[in-house]
Amino acid sequence: VNALSGLQKSCQFNILQDHVGLISVAHQAALRLSSFSNMVDMKTTHTSLPFAGHTLHFVEFDPASFREQDLLWLPHYAQLQHAGRKRKTEHLAGRIAAIYALREYGYKCVPAIGELRQPVWPAGVYGSISHCGTTALAVVSRQPIGIDIEEIFSAQTARELTDNIITPAEHKRLADCGLAFPLALTLAFSAKESAFKASEIQTDADFLDYQIISRNKQQVIIHRENEMLAVHWQIKEKIVITLCQHD
C-alpha cells in the first residue's frame, strides 16, 4: 500500500511538472512575481512583530489545506518532489514569510535552496527562516542574522536532551538563572540555533561549541571561539523566539 501510494504521489507530481513545462518561461516568471494568495490554496495568515530593531514576519498555516500544486509557485519546486508533506508545508510557509520580509527591502523574489539546504538570499541582504508547529517565521537584515522559534520543552524532553545541548557548567548557570529548567534549556537550544544561523560561514560546529555565559531579561550572551554573541529573546505564549545578528 505504501509503495502504491508513493507511486501515485510521484505520478501526480510528474503530471504537475509536465504541465509547468508547457508554460513559457516568461509566463512562469510572471506567475512567480504575482501574489501568491492567488496561486496557493494552503490557508495562511500573516502578522508582523517588531523585535530587537527588526520586523519579524509570522505566517500561520493550515497543513490540511495544502495541495501539491501549491509548490508550483516556487521556482525550485522540483527540489521538493521527494519531500514529505510536513516538509513541503513548512517550506512553503517559510518562503511566504520570507517574501513578506524581503518586501521591506524592495525585493520580489523567492529565496532558493542552497547546497546545504539553506535559504539563498539576494545579494546585499541576509535573512533567516524558522518553523514551529504550524507557524513559520522569517526576518531580513543588511547584516548576517539568525532567527529561531521553538515550543517550550516538556520536562521529559528537557531531561532527554540536556547533555546534547549544554555542558555541565552551562547546566549550573541555567539552574541558577531563575527560569524553570525546561524553559531555560529551550532558550539555550534556541539561542545557539540562532547564533549558528547568524554565522556567515556555517561549519560543523556542535551545540557544545557555543557556550552560554550569561542571561538577562532581554539577551543571552554566547561565547564561541574568539567572539561574544548577543542573542535577543522573548517568550510568546508557549514558544521561545531568539534572534542573533552579527554587526
Question: Where are each of the predicted segments found?
Answer:
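Core catalytic alpha/beta fold that binds nucleotide/phospho-ligands
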Residues: 21, 26-247
